[in-house]
């Protein structure tokens, strides 16, 4: 049992780091009610609800079926890559960057192998960038946006007006980089298993409608979570097991850590000083080290400039492999495949990310 627990924490490095930070933070501030008060239950309930709904759609094959249908008329390797990258970009806005990659990267690997294409690195790397940058346009595109939205720091319109220009430039560059692949003709296998029973589609369609009401803040987050939990327990219990509870636990640990930091006056004063100077730069650089979701949770209480924070953590998903949890997901999925060239993947990933980060920072400089 102990061995399995240790293996789990070795595998989930981000959660392990978050837990260590939370425990060490008790040296700054002894455990008290402030740590419980620091846990943002609205964000956790929304995140749980959205992950459950998307897991339901994935489980019944709906996302896979849509993806295969959209690639049905593709006849070239270049076209296949462009369609999959564009799908990642668009899907990430609706179901989060993590889920977009969990759905489309395995499908990409499958389709490329069926076409006789062994090297998928270029396409998977571009899909990862597409998911990270496409997701920043909407409040539900990634966990850090959802946190800033549910905590009342930014509105849906704020995300759109602030980040859409960056996303548009990123999409154009992504499509241009797809042109580097050859126009080699391929035969794409688009056969797909039929989705599950219609009652599942009705269930998750209804829950999606409730989620839209919760996102619009018409329905309380707890009411959505209750409906999701009761609905899935009654009709589709298997979906509950597919929710990413590791991400939820990571959020809880960082909420506890942030509560300790806020209660420690010297550390609080230092962070406020740093964030007052350049919130975007601090957020971006912090993301490179601890990933952009934890960076957002850590830095949010210490700045009033939520837009600069959002820009910093969203663009901060570019750069290092650990800058975004979604990037680690892609790397794991690719690395688990037969004949994976992890060293080459890392080199291509780093080069492409540096390129996009330079372009995005150049655009930011032009807009300021």
Where are these regions (language model features)?
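Hydrophobic mid-bilayer segments of alpha-helices in multi-pass membrane transport proteins
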Residues: 2-28, 39-52, 201-210, 218-233, ...
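Membrane-interfacial loop-to-helix junctions in multi-pass transporters
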Residues: 41-43, 72-85, 114-123, 199-202, ...
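Flexible interhelical linker loops that connect adjacent transmembrane helices
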Residues: 4, 68, 180-205, 237-241
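Transmembrane helical segments that form the transport core of multi-pass membrane transport proteins
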Residues: 38, 60, 64-69, 207-304
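Interfacial loop-to-helix junctions that mark the boundaries of transmembrane helices
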Residues: 5-11, 33-43, 154-166, 193-198, ...
